[in-house]
């Protein structure tokens, strides 16, 4: 309501529903993601995908997800957990997803205080929040509560119908003159009995080079289960080989709900192989192959200070959104 030019919102008692892992709750979560997540994540997750990922979270991460109810209707959800990719009992991550309308600010405030209370009870030293919507609405909300942005990620996308190898002849020609070979995991695993270890070692070294606000501590079994999910395709992992050594990769993740769109997983090169155009070459090869497979769009996320963002722009990706982390 309004009074004398000021907006007044009634205070609502926080009403939350604990997630119970039932089919109904997974379906509700996916429907809320479709409603509240921005493109390209909208209509990306399926119940099967959510259920699989949830089952992987170790008990030590103490994951908690709640639905937030307002006026008798579920309007969003929030969650807290220790990061499974770099477990630290002193650091608790969180998300809060509700409609970006001022009438829900009171709900958001009460739920954030609920999350912070839980963090204090767990005696963590750092409380972080991640927003899939890098809007000023969310940034202002967290800023008012004393958070500082610690990571800004740019989301970009390319339409493959506008991607042609002729535009990158110099890069392709230069790479062909080298001794490096681009293959995919489907082919390389036939030639390498220790392919899982090789891929993990490459993945771990490349991941350590990504400018994030987290100290990674990859567990092999967790990594394996996360990467090799039921909808994973070995043909979507492109690897650059130098003799017997795996030196660079570009991985892609499919959705069970989208046949024409695919997400980039991880692209990078070992530090000692930098500045040779290897990342550009493997990415060009991957995009051309994905185009042949029938995909129409590829999207990705890069930290603002990640060199891969500039490489992607050079290849024709266009920035379409932002995500951010704060603490």
Question: Which residue stretches match the model-derived regions?
Answer:
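Conserved donor-binding loop and adjoining core beta-sheet/short helix segment
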Residues: 12, 18-26, 30-134, 241-242, ...
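Conserved acetyl-CoA-binding loop-helix of GNAT-fold acetyltransferases
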Residues: 104-117, 269, 275-288, 310-314
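Short alpha-helical
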Residues: 24, 136-137, 306-307
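Acyl-donor-binding surface of acyltransferase catalytic domains
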Residues: 2-12, 84, 99-191, 323-327
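Short amphipathic alpha-helix that is part of the acyltransferase structural core
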Residues: 2-53, 171-217
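A mid-sequence, solvent-exposed acidic-amphipathic segment
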Residues: 213-239, 243-249
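Active-site/acyl-donor-binding loops of N-acyltransferases
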Residues: 145-165, 236-238, 264-265, 288-327
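Extended, compositionally biased non-globular segments
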Residues: 240, 249-250, 273, 278, ...
């Amino acid at each position: 309501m309004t009074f004398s030019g000021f907006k007044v919102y009634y205070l609502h008692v926080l009403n939350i529903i604990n997630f119970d892992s039932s089919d109904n709750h997974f379906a509700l979560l996916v429907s809320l993601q479709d409603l509240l997540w921005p493109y390209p994540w909208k209509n990306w997750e399926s119940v099967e995908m959510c259920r699989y990922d949830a089952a992987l979270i170790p008990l030590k991460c103490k994951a908690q997800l709640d639905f937030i109810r307002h006026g008798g209707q579920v309007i969003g959800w929030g969650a807290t957990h220790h990061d499974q990719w770099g477990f630290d009992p002193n650091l608790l991550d969180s998300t809060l997803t509700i409609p970006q309308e001022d009438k829900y600010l009171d709900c958001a405030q009460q739920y954030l205080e609920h999350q912070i209370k839980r963090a204090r009870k767990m005696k963590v030293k750092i409380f972080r929040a991640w927003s899939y919507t890098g809007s000023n609405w969310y940034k202002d909300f967290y800023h008012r509560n004393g958070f500082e942005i610690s990571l800004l990620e740019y989301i970009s996308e390319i339409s493959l119908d506008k991607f042609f190898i002729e535009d990158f002849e110099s890069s392709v020609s230069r790479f062909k003159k080298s001794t490096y070979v681009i293959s995919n995991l489907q082919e390389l695993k036939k030639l390498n009995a220790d392919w899982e270890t090789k891929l993990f070692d490459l993945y771990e070294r490349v991941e350590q080079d990504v400018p994030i606000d987290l100290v990674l501590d990859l567990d092999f079994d967790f990594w394996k289960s996360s990467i090799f999910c039921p909808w994973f395709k070995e043909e979507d992992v492109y690897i650059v080989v130098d003799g017997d050594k795996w030196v660079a990769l570009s991985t892609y993740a499919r959705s069970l709900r989208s046949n024409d769109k695919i997400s980039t997983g991880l692209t990078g090169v070992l530090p000692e192989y930098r500045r040779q155009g290897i990342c550009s070459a493997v990415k060009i090869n991957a995009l051309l192959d994905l185009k042949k497979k029938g995909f129409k769009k590829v999207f990705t996320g890069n930290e603002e200070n990640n060199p891969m963002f500039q490489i992607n722009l050079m290849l024709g990706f266009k920035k379409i959104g932002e995500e951010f982390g704060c603490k």
